[in-house]
């Protein structure tokens, strides 16, 4: 279990008042991983994670090949998980421990409470979110494109919705 003093070591929690920090410490799960263990896998329910010890690396499944991204390593003080929480989607990249790690895990409700109650925490999350969404967009554009073929009636709502999604996301 994390103490409020331990949580304050991370910038995201340092801006909280004593009562808020104590509440976060009481509710945060204390996750410990060994090198090689998975923190989260693609497709799982999102959580908000703050790394206190160790190093995590992002791993993505690209065209059926597991690809590591050393440029997306996380170290003590870094947080992750905000993108799928804010977009209300499942996790789309996996994270694996490169070394032994200690991580604070907050659920969706705790995360939204954190950014609702703390202007400073909200600003930090939004700044990092913008950077990460830009990286995601750049990486997506650099990948080989796939062609999608849809079978169905033109006027069916499901087919229309799928075509609209593909078009909006520039998928040929």
Go through each PLM region and give its residues:
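Short coil/loop residues immediately preceding or within conserved phosphate-binding loops
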Residues: 7, 28, 45-46, 68-69, ...
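Local sequence-structure signature of Cys/Sec-based thiol-disulfide redox active-site neighborhoods
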Residues: 141-172
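Intrinsically disordered or compositionally simple regulatory linkers and C-terminal tails
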Residues: 124, 128-139
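Short polar/acidic secondary-structure junctions
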Residues: 61-64, 85-86
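Short hinge/gating elements
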Residues: 9, 110-116, 147-149
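Regulatory nucleotide-sensing modules
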Residues: 4-62
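Cyclic-nucleotide recognition modules
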Residues: 69-126
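Short, solvent-exposed alpha-helical surface patches in well-structured domains
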Residues: 20-23, 113, 161
């Amino acid at each position: 279990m994390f103490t409020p003093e331990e949580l304050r070591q991370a910038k995201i929690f340092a801006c909280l008042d004593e009562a808020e920090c104590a509440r976060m410490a009481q509710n945060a799960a204390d996750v410990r991983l060994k090198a090689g263990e998975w923190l989260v896998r693609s497709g799982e329910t999102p959580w908000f994670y703050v790394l206190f010890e160790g190093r995590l690396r992002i791993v993505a499944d690209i065209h059926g090949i597991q690809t590591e991204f050393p440029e997306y390593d996380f170290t003590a003080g870094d947080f992750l998980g905000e993108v799928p929480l804010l977009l209300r989607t499942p996790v789309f990249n996996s994270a694996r421990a490169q070394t032994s790690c200690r991580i604070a895990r907050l659920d969706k409700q705790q995360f939204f409470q954190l950014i609702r109650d703390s202007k400073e925490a909200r600003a930090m999350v939004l700044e990092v979110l913008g950077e990460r969404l830009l990286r995601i967009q750049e990486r997506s554009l650099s990948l080989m494109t796939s062609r999608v073929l849809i079978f169905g009636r033109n006027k069916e709502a499901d087919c229309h919705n799928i075509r609209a999604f593909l078009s909006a996301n520039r998928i040929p």
